[in-house]
Amino acid sequence: MTKWPRFGSCKTRLSKDIGKNNALRIQKQMLSHTFSVSNYIRDQEIAEISIAVTGIGLNSTKRWCKNLGINNFYLQGKGCLGEKMKRQIFKSRRNSINCHKKNIIFIGTDLPNLSHTDIVNTISKLEKKDVILGPSNDGGYWLIAFSQRFISKNNYLPFINIKWSSNEVLKGT
């Protein structure tokens, strides 16, 4: 899930300290890195990759994702981050070829140290665990993953009443 990298609308908290141009440049670099890792995962047939975008319309999203080599894409829609993630789980399951055998992994798009081994390790851990969180230093998490077992049994997902963009996210989840 990501915001379209538009001047003044991405990395808004960071832009207060480094300026909007630098924030945009950093957003584009981190997106490029995330897509590079994601495309490697897809090309190795380790996992399907989907992107959920906000900040642009459907036609622009189609063009952008085509240029990135990403075939599965969605608009995020309205609501808080939790509502958007829950919506993406249902969309992904509905549109997946193997929807009943599918784990769902959300990763941040602002992870300069992300590697394909992070994803491979998460997939491996999902064989035994139903929910995995990759905690971050700011009280949130950089990854949240659900096993297909968990998703198939739970219509409730832990995204309700969370103070998003705060140091309470991990605790609230």
Regions picked out by a protein language model, each given a short descriptive name:
Residues 25-44:
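A short, N-terminal amphipathic alpha-helix
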Residues 47-56:
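Short beta-strand/loop segment that forms part of the nucleotide-sugar
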Residues 112-140:
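Conserved donor-nucleotide/metal-binding helix-loop-beta segment in metal-dependent transferases, i.e.
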Residues 1-14:
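N-terminal nucleotide-binding beta1-loop-alpha1 segment
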Residues 135-136, 141-142, 146-148, 155:
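Active-site rim beta-loop-alpha module in soluble metabolic enzymes
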